């Protein structure tokens, strides 16, 4: 396909945006299940607590779905000349798969290689301290393939640098809901919770990952070694 010869139209951008809205609703349902049930309190009613949870979820979803057209523009502007054809092919592929949305993240919607291509471009924004635009780009990768762990971590790092602590907390919670034994996410999530003095949370995440590695007989793996080192630094 001669991607560079095709015009990436506004209509196609809106098609992508509409489709990603369906998957965003699915993600919101996951997030609601991550919160602890409200408890009776003299300070806040059950309904007030539920409203606060919904506000936090809505805030995160605004982050997650903010301006698809902006993200596409950033990728096309940031990619090197030799990357442009590949990037356009990925976007056209996203449009061509519109009929295959099933109401949940599709682990195979965009391939690992294609995610890595986009992530290399987004990483330049992170390295260049352009965290706001980097966040746009990492979020867009997640919307194309929700099971690419580097994009979740990149998004979290951008929001952390922007000072959006509550968003970072929810990002890691949602990422670990989708990929509970992804050791890349586990290690970065633990580091974040240690940095905000939530050591019990960090230990719980690390221990869960460690136990899974033991179950899989991977005690000699690099992931096991790194988790052990992280646990030693916390305990």
Model segments located where?
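Alpha-helical adaptor scaffolds
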Residues: 107-181
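TPR alpha-solenoid repeat register
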Residues: 151, 185, 219-220
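Conserved positions within tetratricopeptide repeat
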Residues: 135-136, 169, 200-204, 225
């Amino acid at each position: 396909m001669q991607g560079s010869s095709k015009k990436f139209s506004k209509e196609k951008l809106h098609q992508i945006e509409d489709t990603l809205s369906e998957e965003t609703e699915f993600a919101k349902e996951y997030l609601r299940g991550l919160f602890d049930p409200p408890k009776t309190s003299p300070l806040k009613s059950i309904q007030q607590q539920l409203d606060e949870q919904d506000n936090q979820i809505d805030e995160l979803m605004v982050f997650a779905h903010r301006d698809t057209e902006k993200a596409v523009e950033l990728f096309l502007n940031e990619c090197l000349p030799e990357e442009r054809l590949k990037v356009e092919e990925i976007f056209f592929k996203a449009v061509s798969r519109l009929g295959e949305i099933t109401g949940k993240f599709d682990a195979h919607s965009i391939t690992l290689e294609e995610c890595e291509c986009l992530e290399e471009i987004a990483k330049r924004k992170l390295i260049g301290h352009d965290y706001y635009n980097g966040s746009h780009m990492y979020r867009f990768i997640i919307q194309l393939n929700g099971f690419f762990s580097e994009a979740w971590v990149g998004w979290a790092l951008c929001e952390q640098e922007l000072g959006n602590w509550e968003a970072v907390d929810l990002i890691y919670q949602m990422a670990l809901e989708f990929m509970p034994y992804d050791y890349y996410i586990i290690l970065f999530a633990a580091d974040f919770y240690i940095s905000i003095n939530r050591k019990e949370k960090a230990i719980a995440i690390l221990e869960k990952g460690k136990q899974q590695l033991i179950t899989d007989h991977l005690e000699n793996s690099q992931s096991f070694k790194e988790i052990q080192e992280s646990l030693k630094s916390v305990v």
